[in-house]
Amino acid sequence: MWVTKLLPALLLQHVLLHLLLLPIAIPYAEGQRKRRNTIHEFKKSAKTTLIKIDPALKIKTKKVNTADQCANRCTRNKGLPFTCKAFVFDKARKQCLWFPFNSMSSGVKKEFGHEFDLYENKDYIRNCIIGKGRSYKGTVSITKSGIKCQPWSSMIPHEHSFLPSSYRGKDLQENYCRNPRGEEGGPWCFTSNPEVRYEVCDIPQCSEVECMTCNGESYRGLMDHTESGKICQRWDHQTPHRHKFLPERYPDKGFDDNYCRNPDGQPRPWCYTLDPHTRWEYCAIKTCADNTMNDTDVPLETTECIQGQGEGYRGTVNTIWNGIPCQRWDSQYPHEHDMTPENFKCKDLRENYCRNPDGSESPWCFTTDPNIRVGYCSQIPNCDMSHGQDCYRGNGKNYMGNLSQTRSGLTCSMWDKNMEDLHRHIFWEPDASKLNENYCRNPDDDAHGPWCYTGNPLIPWDYCPISRCEGDTTPTIVNLDHPVISCAKTKQLRVVNGIPTRTNIGWMVSLRYRNKHICGGSLIKESWVLTARQCFPSRDLKDYEAWLGIHDVHGRGDEKCKQVLNVSQLVYGPEGSDLVLMKLARPAVLDDFVSTIDLPNYGCTIPEKTSCSVYGWGYTGLINYDGLLRVAHLYIMGNEKCSQHHRGKVTLNESEICAGAEKIGSGPCEGDYGGPLVCEQHKMRMVLGVIVPGRGCAIPNRPGIFVRVAYYAKWIHKIILTYKVPQS
């Protein structure tokens, strides 16, 4: 009998010794629960509820305003007659339903419900432990050596003081392994073997269970804490850290709950943290033993052209679009970076070849120019996705192929889900018989080929990577000789030997790259600037600003009229256009100094010898450049005559317009790219062309070739109509 009395005494001595050792550092993940927003402890299943089949199961309901309030009560079990394992938030009735069970429990079934969201406490459904496993509430009931656990409420064969009533909130239920005091070794239990009092259980660390391939772009596991133990912030929450990665904006990135993800091409998955002082950290996810990507995740490798966004490009082009050589990926000079071959083993970062390791718009590289960190390799041609077997004639309005992916790699969404949007920008009833499934089509007679809607709110639609059939000469614009003006886009150039201008140029935009002027642009709507693709050497939009209402490129004397706006999105023009529509973070305020310029009508032409003007802050040919906006006067030249001036080396097509200088040596140069060729007709000024990098700078008897805005007018109007913009 003395043995049974001595064991509790020894256990009490052990407990007292443990209490003396308690004041040690507790990891953030296990010691900061009071600071946490408890909604992060739950796995969310949208549009789902639980229906109890067993009538004996209890449910508690109450009116609440938010799911966060439901989570707080469930976590604390405040006012609940049971241990809460899950809850459902009824969004329509603003009501919470708390459950002592979850979707894994018997006597319960899942059911779809548009107004419901199901939240299940992760601790009850997780099959691994974090840290010491203090929060583990799974159902493992066997020790490491295979002995069955003794129930916590039983004193046979071992007496103990770890009673469920003494450890409320520790879930000492049944005979499940637990670690109520957070001791070293992880969850444990008293055993059913009289010879072995207690033993730890063999429950793996979550970091051992989870694994990723490559850099984890396709990782969709359940890791929800960082490598230092910090709990991740939910992707659908903006506290404590505001961010852009909202699940509804990026439906293909797997932004479920607060699980680690890699949406932006980092070396490995990461997350925002609940620590207000630590914005984000990487997650400790090991590489899978079979470090090969699934077939659905592997981009098609190409060497001569790019497909989609060029993530599979493995060619040897090693300069950016303007000829600047690329920096070696394994070098940190002149630009330091973490895009090294060691960090991105699956991305073929050899030598200094153009690559797209982070899912950017197209292949790129760091440059050897210390002043230009990054540049796109946009000179690499796009592949025909169907290798010549799938093509369209004319503008593709009769295309009936089976391609269902956009040029940027997004999967097309079903046409029948987008008919309301389609009716907003066409004035006739589309032929529904042609709009099969989610195949690329051209129901609105778009001049630039088949397209489709996407599931991405930021890119509601885009063109498909289908080429015109070889030898097809069907014009995509009819009545090209009609004397009406059309729409435009711009590129960056500098006006050489122009005269200063001040009046009626409120639509001129100075695009700034790291606070220095790099390109011109035209304000065509309060939230949209038309400019050139070559104006964006960096992929980071935070590097850019738009200055409006200025005359001096440095802003001197323009303080009262200058507006400085951030850039929120770049929408690239149809294939080969070199155009970009730049969306501003907030609308420009139209006043005496800032105004918009009109677009021409689609497909129109302007008569030869019409006097037009180009504007810009680029290279002037003057030693002491004063930084003022300049204008140079040009006249429209026919395509045939323009080709003669270029000694037959240039053949202009329907997407280009030519203009020669009235004054020898005048014209656009570097720094003016993206700016407008402005013409007037019927007392209306409009942007007819966009300045793009040409063949030399203001060369005598060498007219300039511009992007013809009229050819792309419908595309511009379609973007403005269908893309969401911020409200003023």
From Swiss-Prot:
Gene3D superfamilies: Hepatocyte Growth Factor (3.50.4.10), Plasminogen Kringle 4 (2.40.20.10), Trypsin-like serine proteases (2.40.10.10)
Effect of residue 494 to Q: Loss of activity due to absence of proteolytic cleavage
Record's keyword terms, sorted: Deafness, Disulfide bond, Glycoprotein, Growth factor, Kringle, Non-syndromic deafness, Pyrrolidone carboxylic acid, Repeat, Serine protease homolog, Signal
Post-translational modification: The single-chain precursor undergoes proteolytic processing by TMPRSS13 resulting in an active two-chain form. The single-chain precursor undergoes proteolytic processing by HGFAC resulting in an active two-chain form.
GO cellular component, one term: extracellular space
Residues of the Peptidase S1 domain: 495-721
Modified residue annotations for Pyrrolidone carboxylic acid: 32
Gene Ontology BP terms: cell chemotaxis; cell morphogenesis; cellular response to hepatocyte growth factor stimulus; epithelial cell proliferation; epithelial to mesenchymal transition; hepatocyte growth factor receptor signaling pathway; liver development; mitotic cell cycle
UniProt-annotated glycosylation sites, renumbered to this chain: 294, 402, 476, 566, 653
Record-annotated disulphide pairs: 70-96, 74-84, 128-206, 149-189, 177-201, 211-288, 232-271, 260-283, 305-383, 326-365, 354-377, 391-469, 412-452, 440-464, 487-604, 519-535, 612-679, 642-658, 669-697
Coiled-coil intervals: none
Ranges for domain Kringle: 128-206, 211-288, 305-383, 391-469
A Pfam family hit: Kringle
Signal peptide region: 1-31
Record-annotated PAN domain positions: 37-123
PROSITE patterns for this protein: KRINGLE_1 (PS00021), KRINGLE_2 (PS50070), PAN (PS50948), TRYPSIN_DOM (PS50240)
Gene Ontology molecular function: chemoattractant activity; growth factor activity; identical protein binding; signaling receptor binding
Disease per UniProt entry: Deafness, autosomal recessive, 39: A form of profound prelingual sensorineural hearing loss. Sensorineural deafness results from damage to the neural receptors of the inner ear, the nerve pathways to the brain, or the area of the brain that receives sound information.
Function: Potent mitogen for mature parenchymal hepatocyte cells, seems to be a hepatotrophic factor, and acts as a growth factor for a broad spectrum of tissues and cell types. Activating ligand for the receptor tyrosine kinase MET by binding to it and promoting its dimerization. Activates MAPK signaling following TMPRSS13 cleavage and activation.
Subunit-structure text: Dimer of an alpha chain and a beta chain linked by a disulfide bond. Interacts with SRPX2; the interaction increases HGF mitogenic activity.
Homology family: Belongs to the peptidase S1 family. Plasminogen subfamily.
This protein's name: Hepatocyte growth factor
Protein's organism: Homo sapiens
